[in-house]
Design a protein with these regions (language model features):
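Short C-terminal domain-edge/linker segments immediately following a structured domain
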Residues: 45, 82-87, 125-127
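Short helix->loop/beta-hairpin flanking segments within DNA-binding domains
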Residues: 86-110
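Low-complexity, flexible helical/coil segments
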Residues: 49-51, 92-96, 118, 130-133
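Short, well-structured alpha-helical interface segments that form or flank functional binding sites
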Residues: 27-33, 88, 126, 130
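DNA-contacting interfaces and partner/effector-binding or oligomerization modules
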Residues: 1-58
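Residue-level detector of alpha-helix boundaries and kinks
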Residues: 19-20, 78, 102, 113
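Phosphate-/nucleic-acid-contacting segments
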Residues: 101-147
Length: 147
């Protein structure tokens, strides 16, 4: 998949599937969700790709479709930027995990390496690991005498 993205051809993540790509670059990562442009000039520096869900890449069929795909890619980048605007690393980690849990099932998210999420929001992989644990701790019910 990384070779396809680095080929220089503009491709589009299939907008009809609940899927996407985490595109790993040297010092950061970017998420491209359904309908987003990948490849072309955007991703010449792609080092690896993590496929989320049942992802499929397609060639844009028209200039309008290319334009729309660029717009969608920018929207995904802006969403990640909103998370990185928070100064606390734990908050950034929690936000990216919450966002992915809204869109993807728990099993899919569990397969994404901590390092990939970390590169999306500029935190250490250990911060993601700790946030995953705190998000999925079972809540303890305190018994009172009335119970």
């Amino acid at each position: 998949m990384a070779q396809s993205i680095r080929s220089g051809h503009l491709l589009v993540v299939d907008r009809k599937r609940r899927s996407g790509l985490i595109i790993l670059k040297e010092f950061h990562a970017e998420f491209a969700g359904p309908g987003a442009a990948v490849g072309g000039l955007f991703d010449e520096d792609c080092q690896a790709v993590i496929i989320i869900g049942d992802s499929c890449l397609m060639l844009p069929e028209s200039p309008d479709e290319r334009q729309e795909a660029y717009k969608i890619r920018r929207q995904w980048i802006r969403l990640a930027q909103q998370f990185t605007d928070h100064s606390l690393p734990t908050e950034r980690a929690r936000m990216i995990l919450n966002q992915f849990e809204i869109y993807f099932d728990q099993d899919t998210i569990a397969r994404v390496p901590d390092a990939a999420f970390a590169q999306l929001v500029g935190v250490l992989p250990n911060t993601i690991r700790l946030s995953r644990r705190s998000l999925h701790k079972p809540s303890l019910k305190v018994r009172t005498q009335a119970d």
